[in-house]
Amino acid sequence: MKPVWVIILGWILLVPRVGTAWRGPPEEASFYYGTFPPGFSWGVGSSAYQTEGAWDEDGKGPSIWDAFTHGRKEQVLGGDTADTACDSYYKVQEDIALLKELQVSHYRFSLSWPRLLPTGVRAEQVNKRGIKFYSDFIDALLKSNITPVVTLHHWDLPQMLQVAYGGWQNVSMTRYFSDYADLCFEVFGDRVKHWLTFSDPRTMVEKGYETGLHAPGLRLQGTGLYVAAHHIIKAHAQAWHSYNNTWRSKQHGLVGISLNCDWGEPVDIDNPDDIEAAERYLQFCLGWFANPIYAGDYPQVMKDHIGTKSAEQGLEMSRLPTFSLQEKSYLKGTSDFLGLGHFTTRYITQRKYPSHQGPSYQNDRDLVELVDPNWPEMGSPWLYSVPWGFRRLLNFAQTQYGDPPIYVTESGAPQKLHCTQFCDEWRIQYLKGYINEMLKAIKDGVDIKGYTSWSLLDKFEWEKGYADKYGFYYVEFNVRNKPRYPKASVQYYKEIITASGFPNPQEVESWRLKALETCSINNQMLATEPLLRHMHVASEIVVPTVCALSILTAALMLTLLLRRRG
């Protein structure tokens, strides 16, 4: 039997294949040729902290990620920061030109809360320069016939709120977030019609309050992430009600949330324990946030498992907070659409973790995640290309949450190591497979309105620094003006958008060949023009070196002159 890699709390173990799990789903093996419905929206995404730079300019306040990368350099690969990132704050027109080249119909980006409210509190200070920046950016997008899809909060909480209140551990964040959201609705809502309150809050709380790998870097295992999530869910609902009560009748927009989840497939489809474990995986991942928003409360399996574990650990109350009857009613139905992010798939099997091991999110789930070594590995060790899982997740979301309109808010793959810079054929295959499974899900009856590929640019990738490169456009971070260069996937994605699907085998294959031909030309061009590529780097190195040598020479001459006089 061949081995399977198992991921358990960051450790990698080796176990044999078991049962009947390692099947290739025959109904999903064939490629489907067809087109998407009229009006389907194609886009790309990014976030403020990862791309903007200008971390302390034009009145912006510090975020928790500024504090984290400046104060804990050992926790970010290479000690990198996003102080300048892609310099998108100063390259608006250049980045919009890239969006136009891709021919996308929408662009998903986030607003920086501390750029608009430096302390995080609306009553204390509103940064007019921040408002002007985003207002001008939105206008420029609309002028280019690109619809803005705006995320209010993508992990960069104002540092002042973290210091003063403990961030999302404090229920007061719900009020401050609602005030911030209301400001955004007021000043941008006449032009923005698609809002996302939060982006992937599960990862935000798990890595920020459980493992400490992300800002604010807290390790409150088995408690902190549930408290933070509880407050985030309330904050989302409060922002939705604010829009619904005050702005909807005037602006006619939509407010949702972006929730990321991988698909969980039972290792053995004939084993009830594995089936239950896979369901539990999805509920602890997607249901954790989606269930309160669509049904008013946490999934029953979360309440049961965390409650039982808490009791076994000698606690009088569950570590999972509870909603009051009034809060349940307030939460239910607070989303105009479901934003769904998806990257990969896991096989899931049952495993009972003893309660004496201590509280943790991983132990609460009582399961193990596995991957098939035959799955194509992308550029990051956690991400494998498993397109069929995407279709299954989309169908699950439709059934679980009452057939909501779904916008795919992020999906993509990073660059492989040791690859040709621009010839990202693995990303082309990823796009082809995942978008095709999304098309199949639409044929299944899932109401999918749009797709956002992640991401426009190579950018700062949190604890990975600049190592993981998800962009359609390569960014030369070592050059002062950070030029952008298209990868092969730009041409391929553009063809999918133009055709709105996959017309026939011959045409789809011609797209791939054309894209790879284009990237080869780009690689050759850059290889023959190294001086032009690195002129800025050379100026940054040579000029200071010449100045330093001049100073040293002058100092030496002065020393010799003084000695002669002495």
Curated annotation (Swiss-Prot):
Membrane topology: Single-pass membrane protein
Expressed in which tissues: Strongly expressed in the lens of the eye, where it localizes to the equatorial epithelium and outer layers of newly extending fiber cells (at protein level). May also be expressed in kidney and skin. However, another study suggests that expression is specific to eye and is minimal in other tissues.
Function: Plays a role in formation of the lens suture in the eye, which is important for normal optical properties of the lens.
Binding partners and assembly: May form dimers.
Glycosites: N170, N244
Main location: endoplasmic reticulum
Protein's name according to its UniProt entry: Lactase-like protein
Gene Ontology BP terms: carbohydrate metabolic process; lens morphogenesis in camera-type eye; visual perception
MF (Gene Ontology): hydrolase activity, hydrolyzing O-glycosyl compounds
Annotated localization: Endoplasmic reticulum membrane
Keyword annotations: Endoplasmic reticulum, Glycoprotein, Membrane, Sensory transduction, Signal, Transmembrane, Transmembrane helix, Vision
Disruption phenotype: No visible phenotype. The lens of the eye appears normal in young animals. However, formation of the lens suture is abnormal with an X-shaped or double-Y shaped morphology instead of a tight Y-shaped pattern. Optics of the lens are distorted and cortical cataracts develop; the phenotype progressively worsens with age. Expression of CLIC5 in the lens epithelium is almost completely absent.
Native source species: Mus musculus
Entries under Pfam families matching the protein: Glyco_hydro_1
Keyword Transmembrane: yes
Matches recorded under InterPro entries: Glyco_hydro_1 (IPR001360), Glyco_hydro_1_N_CS (IPR033132), Glycoside_hydrolase_SF (IPR017853)
Extracellular side: 21-540
Family: Belongs to the glycosyl hydrolase 1 family. Klotho subfamily.
A GO cellular component entry from the record: brush border
Keyword Cell cycle belongs to the record: no
Gene: Lctl
Cytoplasmic side: 562-566
